[in-house]
């Protein structure tokens, strides 16, 4: 029999084992589509970002004008920018749904895969943050000032750390230059960590909605899931293109159409929608260091999830009580997102504090308690 180059060539063999002949559970649902969608998001963002970087100038006097120039004078520059800006939103939608899937179906029990995923989330958040500063509008400047200033809450080294990050005594030209360098570098780091993430996943194989071993019923990734992923891609591209072409500024802040001015503070400083849940948790604590710790905990709590798993069943498919709690957590995050966009006044302050408290309570206390209760119910 003639050798198959797809299975014998050192490079093609790796691609074949990851994307073509990969044994995959036969019953994974559409919730398993988001991994490939995230890969497509990353590819799109790197491509559009590269094209934008060719026309961008990382200088405080020219940054705002260079972005305007890209949109006005570069062939399809407006489209590239709109796809890049709104592509970030879709990246976060996909990663939130991907994490939600992992929580619901107990995928976090693959600890290495889960931990590399958390690292990916943190890197993505860092990339989005430094990227938002680059157009050098009002919200870019003040967002950068407020968020970087939080590091000054770190005892003893805080102030030195902030001035080191800024490259001066305030957010200025050196800050913009280094943020551009970081925004260029981080997506390639994300791509590298993604390969690690995939490598760990392929050590164990995919989880499935039943949470039981699927070794007895595997199907090849291609053509079944390759086709399913292409369908998922078209279903994601449709709303992305609709948003980028019909209302590209829907998710942006109007304040960012004004060039950065250190002498005028915007009435409401708030980040992009995908950071609002964490921003609400930060604001709900009246102490600076406490707020920073809560902000960090709101994301790093994901690292604790595998250790808080007390159920005898892996997934929530047959656990109605945990399901109820899960959807309560989703609703809670939506409330946090909404509160984060509101001004700091009554009743939003107390709503934010209650939502922040319940966020940590659900994850740290109620989930393990409910799992233990469900285990007991199984015995009767």
UniProtKB/Swiss-Prot annotation:
Source organism, top-level taxon: Eukaryota
Recorded GO MF terms: metal ion binding; ubiquinol-cytochrome-c reductase activity
Required co-factors: heme b
Protein's GO biological process: mitochondrial electron transport, ubiquinol to cytochrome c
Transmembrane segments: 34-54, 78-99, 114-134, 179-199, 227-247, 289-309, 321-341, 348-368
InterPro entries membership: Cyt_b/b6_C, Cyt_b/b6_C_sf, Cyt_b/b6_N, Cytb/b6-like_sf, Cytochrome_b, Cytochrome_b_C_euk/bac, Cytochrome_b_N_euk/bac, Di-haem_cyt_TM
A Gene Ontology cellular-component term: mitochondrial inner membrane
Location within or outside the cell: Mitochondrion inner membrane
Its membrane topology: Multi-pass membrane protein
Subunit structure as annotated in this protein's UniProt entry: The cytochrome bc1 complex contains 11 subunits: 3 respiratory subunits (MT-CYB, CYC1 and UQCRFS1), 2 core proteins (UQCRC1 and UQCRC2) and 6 low-molecular weight proteins (UQCRH/QCR6, UQCRB/QCR7, UQCRQ/QCR8, UQCR10/QCR9, UQCR11/QCR10 and a cleavage product of UQCRFS1). This cytochrome bc1 complex then forms a dimer.
Protein family according to the UniProt entry: Belongs to the cytochrome b family.
Note: Heme 1 (or BL or b562) is low-potential and absorbs at about 562 nm, and heme 2 (or BH or b566) is high-potential and absorbs at about 566 nm.
Task of the protein: Component of the ubiquinol-cytochrome c reductase complex (complex III or cytochrome b-c1 complex) that is part of the mitochondrial respiratory chain. The b-c1 complex mediates electron transfer from ubiquinol to cytochrome c. Contributes to the generation of a proton gradient across the mitochondrial membrane that is then used for ATP synthesis.
Protein name: Cytochrome b
Species for this entry: Tragopan satyra (Satyr tragopan)
Name of the gene this protein is made from: MT-CYB
